[in-house]
């Protein structure tokens, strides 16, 4: 059976009117994907009757929870490495991994008059700049790679404040705890104010985000992952500021 036919079959089972009893699945979701995941969960629930309960956090922290037995039915990471490790360690359903979104990094300031870009970082007209923890958050790692590419990582190190995930990092900027910081471009659309610079992908490694199924018995989780790959799901992901794989 081809991947496309398998996807159609899973969606047909999950979305069929009156199909089985309504199921609920707890899903681990990288913080940067919060808004998109909420929209996708609502759409999927309306179509299928199945409920998706997302739990948000840094990819590394969620991976650790899953490795220690946390009862998630699926994992939407902000990288490819952690889902691959779960597959390698037989903690995920074989063959279930796929790239659901490709993210973009942005430098963001709540000050709409700020002119952001490499010169802003070099001139450093700020006391604090926020990034997510590079050890656990892929967008934080991409931020550090950007500073390294610009030769500014050592110079700016004393001014860096680290959020435990990209959601907290955004809050640092929005609250004024940091004048600027690196976030997911998708978060900026929800802000409705401020200035931003979309970081060229040449300055950091690609932010390909993979999903993996953890509980093969979860009808809701299997259907939800299939929905992410459907035309409707991909359109929602695109509307929230992500590219989707061909």
Regions found by a protein language model. Give the residues of each.
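Bacterial N-terminal signal peptides
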Residues: 5-16
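N-terminal secretory signal peptides that target proteins for export/translocation
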Residues: 1-3
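Sec/Tat signal peptide C-region and signal peptidase I cleavage site
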Residues: 18-22
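Basic, amphipathic juxtamembrane/active-site segments
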Residues: 94
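Exported/periplasmic ABC-transporter solute-binding proteins
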Residues: 23-55, 60-68, 75-80, 84-90, ...
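Short, flexible coil/linker elements and helix-boundary hinge sites characteristic
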Residues: 16-17, 49
């Amino acid at each position: 059976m081809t991947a496309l036919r398998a996807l159609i079959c899973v969606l047909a089972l999950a979305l069929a009117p009156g199909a089985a009893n309504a199921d609920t699945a707890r899903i681990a979701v990288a913080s940067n994907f919060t808004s998109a995941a909420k929209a996708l969960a609502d759409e999927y629930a309306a179509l299928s009757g199945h409920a998706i309960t997302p739990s948000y956090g840094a990819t590394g922290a969620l991976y650790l929870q899953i490795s220690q037995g946390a009862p998630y039915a699926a994992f939407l990471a902000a990288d490819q490495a952690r889902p691959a490790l779960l597959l390698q360690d037989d903690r995920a359903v074989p063959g279930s991994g796929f790239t659901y979104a490709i993210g973009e990094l942005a430098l963001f300031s709540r000050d709409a008059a700020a002119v952001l870009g490499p010169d802003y970082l070099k001139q450093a007209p700020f006391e604090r700049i926020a990034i997510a923890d590079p050890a656990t958050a892929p967008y934080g790692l991409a931020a550090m790679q950007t500073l390294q590419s610009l030769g500014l990582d050592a110079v700016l190190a004393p001014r860096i404040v680290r959020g435990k995930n990209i959601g907290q990092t955004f809050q640092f900027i929005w609250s004024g705890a940091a004048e600027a910081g690196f976030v997911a471009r998708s978060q900026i659309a929800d802000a409705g104010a401020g200035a931003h610079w979309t970081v060229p992908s040449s300055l950091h490694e690609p932010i390909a985000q993979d999903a993996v199924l953890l509980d093969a018995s979860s009808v809701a989780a299997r259907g939800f992952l299939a929905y992410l790959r459907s035309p409707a799901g991909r359109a929602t992901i695109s509307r929230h500021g992500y590219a989707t794989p061909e």
